[in-house]
Amino acid sequence: MIKSFKHKGLKLLFEKGVTSGVPAQDVDRINDRLQAIDTATEIGELNRQIYKLHPLKGDREGYWSITVRANWRITFQFINGDAYILNYEDYH
């Protein structure tokens, strides 16, 4: 279950369906990924080829990343079946 957001646009999309805070061409993909994250009870459930799930390293250790489009990712921490600090970013 999603517990917290860093990115205000993701939060508005997830909680209220407001699309103005994310790129219009990515709304469907972002919604798909948010729903998958929200229903996942373990990180392995997000290990779909299309998501390219992977753990981050270095100063981002403890965070996971899934692909939305090109370099854009949803990053988050996954602790005891819950997702925290969801962000939409290009960290490359």
Curated annotation (Swiss-Prot):
GO biological process entries: negative regulation of cell growth; negative regulation of cell population proliferation; negative regulation of translation; plasmid maintenance; RNA catabolic process
Highest taxon of source: Bacteria
Positions marked as site (Interaction with HigA): F14, N31
EC number, as in UniProt: 3.1.-.-
Effect of H92Q: Loss of toxicity and mRNA cleavage, but still binds to ribosomes
InterPro entries xrefs: HigB-1 (IPR007711), RelE/ParE_toxin_dom_sf (IPR035093)
Signal peptide: none
Active site feature: H92
Keywords: Endonuclease, Hydrolase, Nuclease, Plasmid, RNA-binding, Toxin-antitoxin system
Assembly with partners or alone: Forms a complex with the antitoxin HigA which inhibits the mRNA interferase activity. The heterodimer dimerizes to form a HigB-(HigA)2-HigB tetramer that is able to bind to the DNA.
Function: Toxic component of a type II toxin-antitoxin (TA) system. A ribosome-associated translation-dependent mRNA interferase. Inhibits translation by sequence-specific cleavage of mRNA. Prefers either in-frame or out-of-frame 5'-AAA-3' codons (lysine). Also cleaves the first three AAAs of stretches of four or more A sequences. 20% of codons containing AA are cleaved and occassionally cuts even at a single A.
Protein name listed in UniProt: Endoribonuclease HigB
Organism encoding this protein: Proteus vulgaris
Chain's gene name: higB
